[in-house]
Amino acid sequence: VNLFKVNYRMHDKYLIVDEKMYLLGGRNSNDIFLGDQTKGINEDRDILVYDTSEGQGESLNQLEDYFHKIWKESCVSIKKGKQSSRYTDVYRHMEEIYISLLKRYNDIETYSAWEKDTIEANKITLINNGIEAGRKTPQVLQTIQYLTENADHVIIQTPYVICNGYMYDVLQGISDHAKLQIVLNAVEKGSNPWGCTDYLNQKKKILETGADVYELMNDYPVHTKAVLINDRLSVVGSYNLDMRSTYLDTELMLVID
């Protein structure tokens, strides 16, 4: 048993529907993110991409290819279990939830204005951090560094910041030629106590890169991961500005022009 593999996680989050559209961001599939929004709430950001070319969209194809590569990884095992009364009860409970949602949002099954309610993009590109269950090359951070080379203004939103020397060098390099702003949770407001508390140790080093740091005192923790480059590029997905996202976990980000 390779115990080191326990440390590597699949951290990307996406939903593909009928080769027509997909939803991608940082939102987990539990009650904090998808529940009734009455307790334990986290605020997040997702991107809905609607493909008008009937399955020929570049980013949609990239995402489907990525899924199949993950599915075929040697570390992936198919779980087969016998149907039990427990599963039947859960299924019935989910049906009841769906019926209640139909009452609140009666256009769930009939809504069709996807093209009208979305904004056309010049180009959407999927970037990832590698799929192997092992230490990864920091592909997402390197791509962000490349995209910001000629930028005048860069805004990074992340739940928290935990960097090593290389990552600080990247931030320093950005702030040398651009106005760099980092938006994160205040320590007392974040939902990840380990990540947010370490900010107290990291704060001086972050400020020494030349970045302006804004600590959010929202009613609810913010789980958003995004980079805005000038007034043109948005980079949104699952990548936190920390060493786990940079070197260990699978991550996906959309670059939207």
Regions found by a protein language model. Give the residues of each.
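Charged, low-complexity intrinsically disordered terminal segments
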Residues: 1-13, 17-257
